[in-house]
Amino acid sequence: VRAESTVATQKYVWKNVKIEGGGGFITGIVFNPKEKNLVYVRTDIGGAYRSTDGGNTWTQLMSWVSFDEWNLLGVESIATDPVDPNRLYIAAGTYTNSWTNMNGVLLRSKDKGNTFERTPLPFKLGGNMPGRNMGERLAIDPNNNSILYLGTREGNGLWKSIDYGVTWKKVDSFPNPGTYIEDPNCPNDYLNHITGVVWVVFDPSSGKPGEGSKVIYVGVADKNTSIYYTKDGGQTWEPLPGQPTGLLPQRAKLSSDGMLYITYSNTQGPYNGDYGEVWKYNTKTREWKNISPMPAKDTYFGYGGLAIDAQNPKVVMVAALSSWWPDTYIWRSTDGGETWKCIWEWAGYPNRTLHYTMDISAAPWLNFGITSPVPPETSPKLGWMVATLEIDPFNSDRMLHGTGATLYGSDDLTKWDRGEKITIKVKGIGIEETSVAALVSPPVGPHLFSAIYDIAGFRHDDLEKAPSWTYTQPNMGSTTDIDYAELNPNFMVRVGNVDKKWNP
């Protein structure tokens, strides 16, 4: 019998099915202050991404994570080194509750995230827990980049590394690990956890290169005392005198002229919060000032995203975290928060004057099938859950802001100051962080149909292009499964979750 030749094994080439735009919550944006165009984003379930073109396109840095280590894909915080741009740190861990038994991991890279070394941490991290919108919890001392601080949850306090993140030790002198718990009686073990230490900000002017910074500010989820500072490089700590009470500090930034800006909400977020304020603290005169852009009586949301223009410390931007209707708010000030301009304003209800145009051509599905919006709403929206907002330190015209669905941005930001409209574009090209429940590929018709949590799913006519629309008839936020009839592939069924309050 003549032996048959062995059939060669076909080699497969794997690529992402393009969705573009992200499809999930962008929880943090961090520009490197030393290397132009280098920027990172973190997500709650989709890992971390790097851009080397200022945020136009992105590369996934955590595709190496195995199924067994799925918990690493929730990124609690991210830090890019202000001294050595090649160094990158990621605090990885998705849940601090009973949904996983995995502790967090500190990922260390010397090549901008191409490869990582890891340090196991003795506690859990919460990249997809309530308060993931706050930050950044992980920070590098600009006067000694071997020193890092990490704010943690669950009463674990503030931690410090003096060897580039290789080893960590708890800062025993730090007095407050946080007290805030949104709902102590939460039945599903999600809202009943301590939010903890939520951000760390160094004062570069308080030290010399190589010696470390003397002054450090730390934010804590505690409505009584939420901001602490040290004047001796972390040996002793005390509350910052005169600080606001009754609110939780979301984000903080220190401008080059010595102003500490803080956004506040009355809850941890990211979904809720019906009141907030914006404050600035003059670190030279030790004076506080409420610079909230909206009067207290009109505020129905908490504040989140915060940005300062590195080229002009008087330029400050803030965003509403929890304004869902009619849209989010973004404000811009060119005088240190004394006066503000909003990106839209009322023009006699239900009309609004918009100082921007939206371009979603890179991800047309971001209108979520709403082609004839009813005023005052528009489609697409500017966003929701805007926890992070950044101005490129090398380009005052470039802004990025994260939402619950995508990453948006502008390349003509300073037009706003001249009374002209700016353009907001999809900037999440390469970010794919959807939670896919099911896939089917019928023998005829489109290549692929997806069932996806939160954004319904898609008919993928071209795997190399973003879909034009999500499933809308009926409109289900999450599609949990999808299938077709074998004998009639054009007959398809999908099932999912519907919120009867919004879709009666």
Predicted feature residues:
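Extracellular glycan-interacting surfaces
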Residues: 1-504
